[in-house]
Swiss-Prot record:
<keyword id="KW-0963">Cytoplasm</keyword>
<dbReference type="InterPro" id="IPR031157">
    <property type="entry name" value="G_TR_CS"/>
</dbReference>
<dbReference type="InterPro" id="IPR009001">
    <property type="entry name" value="Transl_elong_EF1A/Init_IF2_C"/>
</dbReference>
<feature type="region of interest" description="Disordered">
    <location>
        <begin position="164"/>
        <end position="259"/>
    </location>
</feature>
<feature type="region of interest" description="Disordered">
    <location>
        <begin position="1"/>
        <end position="63"/>
    </location>
</feature>
<feature type="region of interest" description="Several sort of repeats">
    <location>
        <begin position="20"/>
        <end position="131"/>
    </location>
</feature>
<dbReference type="GO" id="GO:0018444">
    <property type="term" value="C:translation release factor complex"/>
</dbReference>
<feature type="region of interest" description="G5">
    <location>
        <begin position="465"/>
        <end position="467"/>
    </location>
</feature>
<dbReference type="Pfam" id="PF00009">
    <property type="entry name" value="GTP_EFTU"/>
</dbReference>
<feature type="binding site">
    <location>
        <begin position="362"/>
        <end position="366"/>
    </location>
    <ligand>
        <name>GTP</name>
    </ligand>
</feature>
<protein>
    <recommendedName>
        <fullName>Eukaryotic peptide chain release factor GTP-binding subunit</fullName>
    </recommendedName>
</protein>
<dbReference type="InterPro" id="IPR050100">
    <property type="entry name" value="TRAFAC_GTPase_members"/>
</dbReference>
<keyword id="KW-0677">Repeat</keyword>
<feature type="binding site">
    <location>
        <begin position="285"/>
        <end position="292"/>
    </location>
    <ligand>
        <name>GTP</name>
    </ligand>
</feature>
<dbReference type="GO" id="GO:0005525">
    <property type="term" value="F:GTP binding"/>
</dbReference>
<feature type="modified residue" description="Phosphothreonine">
    <location>
        <position position="359"/>
    </location>
</feature>
<feature type="region of interest" description="Charged">
    <location>
        <begin position="132"/>
        <end position="271"/>
    </location>
</feature>
Amino acid sequence: MSDDQQYNQDKLSQDFQNTSIGSGEQQQQSYQQYQQQPQQNNFNANSAPTFTPSGQQGGYQGGYQGGYQGGYQNYSQGGYQNYNQGYQNYNQGYQGYQNNNRGGYNNYNNRGGYNNYNNYNQQDQQPVQNQGMSLADFQKQQNAQANLNKPKKTLKLASSSGIKLANAKKAPETESKEATPAATEKEATPAATEKEATPAATEKEATPAATEKETTPAPAKKEATPASVKSESKPASKSTSKVATKESTPVTSDKVIQEQVDEVDEEVVKDMFGGKDHVSIIFMGHVDAGKSTMGGNILYLTGSVDKRTVDKYEREAKDAGRQGWYLSWVMDTNKEERSDGKTIEVGKAYFETEKRRYTILDAPGHKMYVSEMIGGASQADVGILVISARKGEYETGFEKGGQTREHALLAKTQGVNKIIVVVNKMDDPTVGWAEDRYKDCITKLGTFLKGIGYAKDDIIFMPVSGYTGAGIKDRVNPKDCPWYSGPSLLEFLDNMKTMQRHINGPFMLPISGKMKDMGTIIEGKIESGHIKKGGNLLLMPNKASIEVVAIFNETEQECDAAFCGEQVRLKIKGVEEEDLAPGYVLTSPLKPIKTITRFEAQIAIVELKSILSNGFSCVMHLHTAIEEVTFIELKHKLEKGTNRKSKKPPAFAKKGMKVIAILETNESVCAETYADYPQLGRFTLRDQGTTIAIGKITKVL
């Protein structure tokens, strides 16, 4: 470093006159001229009042090196473009300034490498302040900078790291983590400092935050500066530390952070609902078994429906000559259902106990409405099979043509793996809580349920009276029923093992219903993943992008998020209501559900009058979708007991056989393999009003 270089105020104006604005080459020469000079911040005791020794901030040096040198570094590190960009901005600003255009003048003030030239002018006009720095401190700083310069031609390193070090010294508490090691190791490890400093330096010229930093006063000034200047320096250092951190973070980490944000801890869900998980239960059984009455009584006993409403229904039922039906009217809401005393649609209701939240799906028991029942069963976690103990009614429901057997089979096919058999109407005069009648009912049904695949542990029997409420919330009175000491229905449901939920799986919601109400609203059960308000989804098989505008839970209340296993209504944007159909699936755009027309499946034929061969067509119920399907090829017959595949393809299939076949649908249908998502990979085949087969998708073709 040459000792004869001193700060000269007049020299500054000469420098800027000599600097050409018109030619990039001349500008570069000018840069080189200053690059050859190791540094411009020699100490002179006489110029202490107006000289800032750090050489990086404020005054002539800050203006000159912060602007020129900072710009030059960007030119050499980031390539010619960065340099050119700053240069053009300056050029535009300069022209604007010449034309006395105020807007252009602002640009001149705010952009390019010449920021600090203005800063110099402003400083010049301000009253001179006393700025002191001890000789020892200054020499320490000079030594550090000399060390950085020693073996390398890294004038740019000294300049950029100097800025960083100055700031680190001034306000360590606001500095980023990277800057702190740079400050502590500045003398010992120049290489480390270089690493730390580079990310910040690369962005210096482009970022207003960094430019701001260059104009802030140096540490020496801090002791004697008024509060106003001090307050200016803090935000600058804060914003600069942000720049440094942002630059040094790898791009991929953004994705990781996003994934972590999207992940939902099960504990969070517990906190949100007070530790209560959600269970969907479906009431199934033959017509007139008492499903709706029992559902209505549960709502009344749990306080979901108040006494006034029930009293009102009782009066209305009495007036209509249907006195005993008033509890079922809580579930059956339309006139046709009330006048005929039978459910047509799948009724939905919600109740809550101390331990869990429940959605009741009240399935129609009539033969004509089996497809509605299948749609309901596909959304349920637990099945409640209601059978009537009344003489004649049980037999009608259980015999061929009755819905008790078919509902139990359909529930199993749709993934309802736990079934509670509720023997209802035990208080009827023809029964009178008789143990013999109860045993008679459960023996035949138990054998049938085991035959269709229910494990012994997954079947529970209990006697109740849906009308009086005995055995529903409280246990049955021992005086009436001394032979049964098991739990009541709600007691059992509350203490049942918790369901497994894929809260962090890819989002999938098969649409079970749609409506128009100030926008498009769809409803269904979330089979996998979770959704937040404002989230983006994909509608399959349309491949339409959807935005979730609002989420409504079981109680019709708006909420911010919904999770796997919940019954929800979503208000969506991006598709019209007429373009939706039950069976469409809202899915995650990152891992969408598959859309298929041809697949391989394992099929068990449960009821078939004739035989089935290639070309046979029937109706397939898959989650909430209903689609016509054709047998393209029967590939293998499976042996009973061992499930061994036959080498030759069978010519036909008949009742009781298990086969592997290739099926084809007319339209694209959303599905997954049974192994990946059981709820979206199992199906039922129906023909002429009866369930002929059940199956699971083994391969998508």
